[in-house]
Amino acid sequence: MLAKELGFNTASTMYVNNAYGQGLSQEFAKAFKAAGGTVLAEVPHEQVQPTYAAELRRALQGNPDVLLALSYPESANIYLTEAIEGGYKGEFLFCDGTQSIDLVNRVGAQYLNGTYGTVAGTAETDALRIFKEAYEAEYGELPPQPYIDTAYDAVVLMALAAQKAGKADGTSIRDNLRAVANPPGEVVGPGVDGIKKALDLIKKGKDINYEGAGGSQDFDEYGNVVTPIKIWKIENGQIVDVRFVTVTP
């Protein structure tokens, strides 16, 4: 529990009022309470508002040690700035939705340096390097947002499953995802060469095991791909990786 590890005993959340934000806030509150922390408030907000002053007053009542920004940058930009301008002296914690260098620049790195966040993590593997190099060659920059690598893997897996099935309908793709993503089979990776190899092996009737840019793509019994959680930090106005935490379903 990162919040307790950082010494926070009281917390409030500001979360975007949809399934994503609600789920994050509820799961954080449950884990924080189980670790001995006190949740002072869980405050929903709509995505597009000129001000979040009313919601912020509720979230900061009782002066929590930490305010969790469980939103998207366009909203968090506003309410974090309002919190700082209003004199809030506590800390902030971020999620994948607020892992944004644009947010850091808009709010001001001087206010956010030293703060932490979490995101589903991808270790630095050869597969990730191949993907990043290909992305940069095509777009002139490294992937700017979280989950671009995993979105890429999802598209590749659907294509490989369709090839394995010999059909491109939803049911056939679904039923062949594990056949191309999970062991056993020859390991194949992302990139033009990796995908060509995978397609050739499938055409020859061989089993494959796609290991993606976002890490292992093995589906568990519930159809989930479980990845490590990456803890990141804002240092000198930049977002830097700190460490990975293994998740046990």
Language model features: what each stretch is:
Residues 1-249:
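Extracytosolic ligand-binding ectodomains
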